UniProtKB/Swiss-Prot annotation:
Organism field: Drosophila pseudoobscura pseudoobscura
Pro residues composition bias: residue spans: 774-789, 914-926, 1048-1062
Record key words, sorted: Cytoplasm, Developmental protein, Phosphoprotein
Protein name: Ataxin-2 homolog
Gene Ontology MF, one: mRNA binding
Amino acid sequence: MNNNSKRKTRPSGGGGGGGASGGISRYNANDNSLRPANNKSGAAGNSAGAGAGTGGTAIRPVAQGVYNNTFFMHSATALVGSVVEVVLRSGNIYEGVFRTFSGNFDIALELPACIKSKNLPEEGKVPKHIIFPADTVVKIVAKDFDSQYATAGAFKTDEAISDKCNGARLDEKELEPWDSGANGDIDIELDGAANGWDANEMFRKNENTFGVTSTFDDSLATYTIPLDKGDSLEFKEAEAKAEKLAAEIENNPTCRDRLDLENGDEEALFAAVERPEQDHRRDGDRERERNDRDREREERDRDRDRDRGNKPPRGAGDFQLRETMSSDRYITKQTRGPQMSHVSMSSQGGGGGGRDRDNGLMMPGVISGGGAGQGGATQSAAVLLLAGGLKASGPASSANAAGMDASGKYSMVKRKTVTQGGKVMRGNVPPNSSGGGNISAVQGGNGNPVGQSKGGYQPTMVMQNQYAYQGNSQIMHGSSQYRNPSHMSGGPSKLNGDANANTNKPLPQRQIRQYQGSQSNSLNYGGEPQPQMGKPMHSSHGGHPGQNSNSPPLQTGGQPQQQQQQQQQQQQQQAPQQQQHQNMAPQGQQPQPQRQMRSRDNQLQDLRQFGQDFQLAPTNNSPPQQQPQQPQQQQQQQQVQVQVQAQVQQQQQRALLQSASPPQQQSQQQQQQQQQQHVPMQHQGPPPHLHQAALSQPHYVPQPQQQQPQPQQQPPPPQQQQQQQHVPLHLQQKAQQPPQQQQQLVETQHQLVPKQHQQPPAQQQQPQLAPEPSQQPLPLYHPMPPPQTSPVVITSPVLLEAPPPQILTAQQPPQQQQLAATPKPDASPAPGSNTTTPTGIVSTPTTAAASSAGSEKSTPAAASSGATSGTAAAAVGATGATGSTGSTPVVKKHVLNPSAKPFTPRAGAGTPNPSRPHTPQTPVPMPGIYTTTGTHVPAAATNQPIYVVQQQHPFPPPTHPQAGQPPRLRRNNYAPMGASQMHVSATTATGQPLMAAGPMTQFIQYPHAPQQHFQSQGYAPMPMRLYPDQQPQLQFLTQTPQSTTPSPGQPHQPFHPPPQPSPAGGGPQPAYTPPTQQTYQLMCLHSQHVLPNPYFQPQPTPHHAPQNPQYQIVMQQHHAQ
């Protein structure tokens, strides 16, 4: 057997036999006896590790892998230190402490005792260790094994302690507040047996035992510098200074916090015990709190909406609602979707409205009409009873609210009819009459022919034409209503002292009727839209009861004139002057077939029809009507303007602010401004629907009708747009080129507007041109309602009075007109043209702007309140301002920076597209730019073709379904809002042309191509109009091209407004007009309904066309901007 020296010292090694006296013994398997281990050193044995020992002469099998068997190792190791019984092959059983085992599993027991043995060894000799070779061991048994023994009694961490009852103990003791005892003198010593010593005892012992007396003074006097407190003046000053300094330090919030922390109740902050509340009680409280918060939030939202109701709407959808102006408060809110045609009962000049209210008639109805016309889609009837008007008469406001038709769908809104003077006033608003803006003219038939001043409630329920763009105009409209024009007028219609006459009377509530004829017509943007656009008659001839074919007469006093208005619109071409005369009484009243909120299908259908009907210049039918209407309106406006000029000017300024608003807003703003400004003026000319009775009445209040008997309230919004278009258009139409291009129109309008508004009649009713109030006939402005979806042209037909080619002339003439507008009372020949804007859209907004400006006379900006409209409005406003003064042009504000956001008078009527430049805008030399001055800058040479491309939404998906989407209509429906409106707004606000207002849709430049309608798949209205300008002039905006995508925040310095003539002065001369190249004016109208993709095919190269043909790209700013 091998003996290892190691085994002597390492029992675990297998060990050598131990002597009888002890030590390490090795069990001999052969004779079952223990042999003492041999202490002499021998060959190193492997017993400690994996070595194999031999028992006797036999070679023991090696237990391999003992250490490799983790489970075995774990079990065996766990037994180390435990008492085990080892059963041997011989039958002997040993019991001892399991000490260790080797790699071959030789087992070492400590203090073994043989429990059972065949051959009993000497019992007196117990070895200290015995090593049992693996081959002799049968089994090992551990008895009474405690697996936790090794760790039992060890210190437990706090975590281990807390695990037992952490939050799980239910039998907690009831907590009781601590009571200090009766005297509060209880012993609060923590440990009475503290192993410490008392300092006083120390001092005593030192003194008594050691004779050492301590000098310690517990007063700490020796540790601080004693103060020499004296009565000297120096001490007092030093003390006061110290106290002041101390007070500053102590009053420091940080110092206070620290002191509170140090001196505060630490227990309450850090150690107090707080029982968790019952779960259900806690949940109930939380639920209540949540409900309270929700309720508060709803109330805040409601209040905010109510407050906003007085402000111009912010978004196309919302702005309509908001545009409801203060009507939010008084009138049901509109839904976000396309709003029903704006019945817009809003007392149009608040003053007028108030006055009518006294009469029990609401002139206000007209007020919104025009603006609504533009914004029609969005602003639902949002009966824009101006707050003033509404406030004045509860019933009226409720009627308006009803008219609003919360659904905002295109549907006729029925208003309660309020009998005025015993007559039922129905705001018949022809549904969707694109030109229907005139619908307003239901005149309260107080027996008052005009119904303006008297009870003739000319509820011009102007169902706003609903254009995709209309939303803006509506907003604008709402704004133009300006909360209550009466506010503007400083009272219900303080403007005309008489306005108050009706103040006390409730506004008659009207039902808005949709006229079937008008409904579909409203979208006819082509020449056919007469009934709607062209037709929104200003029932100029009282005697033409039949005229009102499109919309049932809103006869309130049986004023056929209202009925006639539509027909008369048609006739108005023939008898614009008649309208002027008649306008006084019936004109405003003729309800125009107004566009009511219509379904997408209707809109699409109208758009398609418009696309088909759209002609560059061919359609003259509606413009004439509008022209005549406008002349009347213009006359009225002029009259009103003359009277209200001062007020108008003020409002024009407001309008300027508003002008930044998107086209619809512009229209609305224009309208509002017109209403506001016109309010004094009576909105006669400017608020298309407003011109209601405004002709004669220079009401400051939007309800021009009330001021002057205006049976025909301005046709409602559609008309408003048309009217606006007419006004500006007519103003432009003087130039007769409105068809040319919206931009040009807008410019022209702006340019003309100031003058034309001065002499809006000049164009429209050239006879009326003189702003004499005497020409009472309010020409209803029937701006052809811009196509709902197709921004390009509703006025295409409108274009027409002047041959569409006149569009070219419109641009130049706009300048001329602008220059000459004031002088020319006889622009009426152009009225037809006027009716139509080249793009119709622009023209509409422009017209609206013009009308508003005209009404406002001093609100060029107001005119620009819509983006496009704004510019036109600005021009118009300038003109209007001028008109207001009579022939005197009003100085127009203009801002130099077209790109600047600030012209985002978004506050304006919920401008869906503030005219602020869109980031993608690509400045391009713009041939025709509308300058803030309102004068027309010959942006594109007259020969320049204008490309009217409907602008896609900013970032619209390739297939922009918006054309068909009514909901988008609210914002997208800004036909007018297209580039021109944006342009106009920018121009108006900044005084400098806006190069590219929004993301540019792919522009296809079709040089020299005659007007082309590009209908994006379903979006017929999306015509691209190529307006060849007669003159090749190019207006180069310096370097505009360099800033391709100016950010709205960064003005394009490159573009500086081309020379801007003052509204009074002639139109601006083109900054640069190289006759060599033909310029193409590319107008990107923002047509929400039109799919931008169709334009995608052509390359957008026109943006920067450095090549010969310069393309003027007016990018409409995205409405979202």
